[in-house]
Amino acid sequence: MSSDSSYYVPESSKLPIFMAFGLLLFVLGAGSTINDLGKESSNSYILLMTSFAVIWGVMFVWFSNVINENNKGMYSDQLNQSFVWGMAWFIFSEVMFFFAFFLALGYVRMFSVPWLGGEGEKAITNILWPAFEATWPVMVTPDNETFPGAEKNMNMPGITKLHTWLPFWNTLCLVTSSGTIALAEAALKKGKRAAFKSWMVVTISLGFIFVFLQGLEYYEAYAHMGLTLGAGIYGTTFFLLTGFHGFHVCLGAIILTIMTIRGFGGAFSEHDHFGLAAGSWYWHFVDVVWIL
C-alpha cells in the first residue's frame, strides 16, 4: 500500500498477465474456429472455450478484489475519479474500434465496389471483371462461380413487412433496454430499491433476448439466405460488424447481470453506485453502435 493514505495504491498483481494470455488464446481460438468452419471435425472450439474460461476467471477475481477494496473503504474520492476517467477512456477506445470497422465499410461501399464496376477515377480496375455491376449489397461477386454471393440480403423489406424483419425487433429490444437501465439508475438515486431491481431484471432480459434474436438471425442468414462469411465483401462486413457488436452486447448483458446480483445483495446506494453507472454507460454505447 502507498505511504500516502489519501490515494490507495494496490499491491502488484499478476492478473494483467493472465488476462493478456487469455486474450491471446481468444485470438488464436477465434481465428482457428472461423478457418475451420465447414470442416467435419475440428478442435479449434476447445481453444476458444479455454480462452473464455481464462478471461472470465481473471475478470471475476479482478472485479472481486476491486469490490472488496471499495467495501473496506480503501478508495478515496480521487481514486473514484480515476475509475470514472478509466471507464471514459475505455469507451472511447471502443468507439475508435468500431469507427475503424465503419470506415472500412464506407471505403468498400464508396470506393472499392464502384471501382470494380467501372465507376470513379480508378475505373480501369473493372477490366478484371468486365461483367461485374457495382451495387450494394453485393449479391453477385466479381468471381461469382468461385465466391458465390448471398441469395438474399438483410435490407429492410418495407414498412408493411417490418414486423417480419428480425433487425427491427433487435433494435426495439436495445432501444427499450437503454430506457429501462436509465429508469433503474434513476430509481436507485431516489432510494427506490424495489423499482431499481425490477428495471434491472427487465434490462438484462431484453439484452439476452437481443442475443437470442441475433443468433436466430445468423441461422436464417446461413440456412435460408446464403449469407455467409464467404459470400463476398457483403457477407464479410455484415458478420464483422454485427458479430463484434453482438459480442459487446453479451459482455454488457453479463456486466449488468453481475450488477443486478450485487443489487439484490444490498450493494449500491443513492450516492455510491459507480459500478452500475459504468455498466449503464457501456450499455448506452452498444445501443448507439447498433443504431448506427
Model-derived regions, located:
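...captures the hydrophobic TM-helix bundle architecture rather than a specific catalytic motif
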Residues: 1-292
